[in-house]
Amino acid sequence: MGWLCPGLTFSVSCLILVWAAGSGVTCVSPGGVRVLEWPICLSDYVSTSTCEWRMAGPVNCSAEFRLSYQLKFFNTENHTTCVPENRAGSVCVCHMLMESIVIVDTYQLDLWAGEQLLWNSSFKPSQNVKPLAPRNLMVHANISHTWLLTWSNPYPSESYLYSELTYLVNISNENDPTDFRIYNVTYLGPTLRFPANTLKSGAAYSARVKAWAQRYNSTWSEWSPSVKWLNYYEEPLEQRLPLGVSISCVVILIICLSCYFGIIRIKKEWWDQIPNPAHSPLVAIVIQDSQVSLWGKRSRGQEPAKCPRWKTCLTKLLPCFLEHGVDRDEDSSKAARNGPSQGPAKAAWRPVEVSKTILWPESISVVRCVELFEAQVENEEEEEEEDKGSFCPSPENSGGSFQEGREGIAARLTESLFLDLLGDESGAFSPQGMGQSCLLPPLENASAPMPWAEFPRVGSPEASSQGKEQPLNPEPSPQATPTQSLASLAFPELPAVIADNPAYRSFSTFLSQSSDPGELDSDPELAEALEEVEPSLPAAPQPSEPPPTLQPEPETWEQILRQSVLQRRAAPAPASGPSSSGYREFVHAVEQGTQDRRAAGSGPCGEAGYKAFSSLLAGSASCPGTSGLEPSSGESGYKPFQSLPPGCPETPVPTPLFTFGLDMEPPPSPQNPPFPGSSAECPGLEPAVKGEDGQKPPLALEQAADPLRDDLGSGIVYSALTCHLCGHLKQCHGQEDGGKVHVVASPCCSCCCEDGSPPMVTPLRAPDAPSSGVPLEASLSPASLALLGVSREGKIPPCLQITPSNVQSSSQTPTAVAMLSPGPACMDTS
């Protein structure tokens, strides 16, 4: 075969290149230049179509390439050639002019590189449309703070694309590429309005627009030339508000700081110079730890934390905001320490006085303390009372100890409360001073006869010697016998010794003013009373020698007390001097109180809660003619205050309420009932002579001591004589013999009363003598005789002599018995 022609060989090679281009292989021109992208053709759908392709390197497009196009219509042979141009280096562009483009037009395109065909294809303009860019873009300012963009349609009105275009508007900030706006204009009019406040005020903006034909499946046109403007407008109030608020805050802060520093400066230069008592050194009180109460101290955990300086400054600056918080913190801390005392944890809100808080000075803690000091003793009497056992301790005795001072004060208060309680209950106490006891005088009339004997004091040698040296001088009686030696004796009052109110005394006063046993005999009134004798009672002869007193040792404390009181009253009294004994007897104190009250001219004493038996006997003598009642086993001369007869003017006396349960009197033995006979002429001792037999042996000590203890017990003054339930004297007696009046016990206690009336107690209830005629001395024990002052030889003191006025019959054995008139005793309670 021969060689192929060169033209055929080149044609085959081009076909291979086209096939390779369709499969991604570039075609190489004969000059050695490669084509990277084949031509892309677009039409503006008016008169021009544009084709462009990209080369691998810089190429002179007009010298190397030729593009020919031909309308395919009825096999026309009219070919048109387009010379390409260079754009952007390696891009070749060729503009093809076409007349009256319609939708059905189709063109054949061929790309030649010299004589070599590189590419050929058909092109339909209606399917490859690229609209023209809009023209005449302009921006207009509106009165209503809006911007208006206008442009013109690139196509004439008779074109098919005139009514088919849509636009895209781009507004961007010249100084900030990120600040841009995109608006789609889908309506037919080539205009756009947008508010100026959507853009930043004072910034330069530019706008551009491009078109797109959606129906022809076109691409976006090129951007139109841009238009620029400066965006400026007046901002509304809501946009200016943040700036105004920030400026206001800064201004307020500056004002507050200036005020604070101004107040600090004023405080240093003016306020601190004002004199303040709190800064005085005299206010600072140094207190020792021993003088501070334990409950006034705070533990370290309870001490409030110091407020920092910044909080103090803010409190002064803004008191309304911080004062409530401080109060709530303090309340919460107190509630945490003290526990939930007010229910729900709700802090008590208190209004704050701003005017006082802003310029209030810094508080200075001043410790306030209360110190107790002993009062200075003003007179010598108070010092003497303190030295003699007052309840108020002196500073020397206390040793400067604060604890002992408090104990002394507590002792004073306790004594005062106790005395006030006694005064309220009995109606007989009137507290006048601390550490004093209330003693009321039992006697109203100093000259009233007292049917009671006085005996020397037990254990006092002076009393016994004085009793021997100063015997009593009663009138002699021919009918007197040793058993008839009981007589009536007037008990005088003692002179006033204490000048203050006698109704309220202390034991220290009695200590300092207690007298010796001879004090009674030194009193002139007592001497007169010793010389007075009842006219109806004959006196017994005075023995030549004083009988020796028998003083057996008492068995109980009652006997000791009674014996001491009786001996004290019977002892002669020398000149008053300092007492060597301990406390004075209560009866003697009552007697002194009586004289003081009478000397002061006071009325009837209704304040005394308790009376001595001798005072009641004296009161009975003041109302003659009322003692005609027949006594029973439970009746005696002593009565409670509510049982006094209403005939006496001084009858109303408050009833004692404190008895202490010590006034229970044992019942008499059934073999010794009291004698019923008594005289109504005058109260006193009345004899009942039944016989002269004195040789009967005496009774046993137990049988004789009980009646004597019951009879002599009425002579002491203490609060246990009256029943605290019924007001009667506490006695328990058996039924009387011989059809006498029956004494029944009260339903609430064991006291005896006759027909509901308060019973009376006989001070000298002698046991009934046996029918054989045993004398009184025989029925008493030696101890009882010693207490009565009767010797074993049968001699008795003349003060106890008894007249034989009541002798029953000659057939009976005469026996002398000392009896009291049971009539109501009228007495003055002052």
Curated annotation (Swiss-Prot):
Gene3D superfamilies: Immunoglobulins. Residues 378-387, 518-534 have a biased composition (Acidic residues). Residues 570-582 have a biased composition (Low complexity). Residues 538-551, 646-655, 665-676 have a biased composition (Pro residues). It comes from the Eukaryota. Keywords: Disulfide bond, Glycoprotein, Membrane, Phosphoprotein, Receptor, Signal, Transmembrane, Transmembrane helix. Residues 564-662 are annotated as: Required for IL4-induced gene expression. Residues 265-830 are cytoplasmic. It is a single-pass type I membrane protein. Residues 378-403, 450-488, 508-610, 623-696, 811-830 are annotated as: Disordered. A motif (ITIM motif) lies at residues 716-721. PANTHER family: CYTOKINE RECEPTOR (PTHR23037), INTERLEUKIN-4 RECEPTOR SUBUNIT ALPHA (PTHR23037:SF32). This is Interleukin-4 receptor subunit alpha.
